[in-house]
């Protein structure tokens, strides 16, 4: 993928206009009245530690960004999502207990897929640099606290032609009423019977390949055949890997940023499909189902709930 294709969307930040800023400010005031004062005793996103307030961040993973990643090994969850032009992005989910003060980035633009994907989490923060103009009203109307350079410029570092980052501590301080970790469908426990030995897992998106190599109880992440790392954190790793097979369809919007039309795509995470579950050097083949946008996702094998290993989970939304 050329540098032009990899980086031509930095201009999206300018599109995060006052329509999102005004809605985000009003929504933040409303959220303060409905947020609980105590965190879950056990984090329902990881099955370990205590829960906290939730921040999701849209993160670049193309070209030079692969050597600029920061904070991913502090995430509770990392989603890999296809976007236009065959590219992909990470949607990383952090909580204030697990990642109280972590540098996160490089940040990129929000997409249509993010809204229903995050709907079960409640009114969490979504940090991104901008969005295509047609999507801005939907982001403003969504049950999300939009956090962008247009809304809160002091929370972001660099920007423009340079990678954009934020510090989780600054976000949690500025937005103390973000929704706390809650059940979005993950269940944790001892590995179920029926797993098959697996030394690695692989997923293919149009513009990138992802591999996860078993190393003890962990899975080490590689992208396009190269070891993936996070600044100051070493090799990217997961305790669980889910390859979630979804329908990827044409999105509602067309991007005209680089002088030509580029159709956005939408990964359907409401519905059902096949899923492959990797934990502890084994694989199980099963299903996922989600009744509605705000419903938890059920992960099953042979009709029984698939139990994950406590820890961080990577979920690749692979087109079926």
Predicted regions and their residues:
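C-terminal region of N-terminal signal peptides and the immediate post-cleavage residues
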Residues: 27-48
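A surface/extracellular/periplasmic glyco- and lipid-processing/surface-interacting theme
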Residues: 41-77, 84-320
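N-terminal export and membrane-targeting signals
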Residues: 2-23
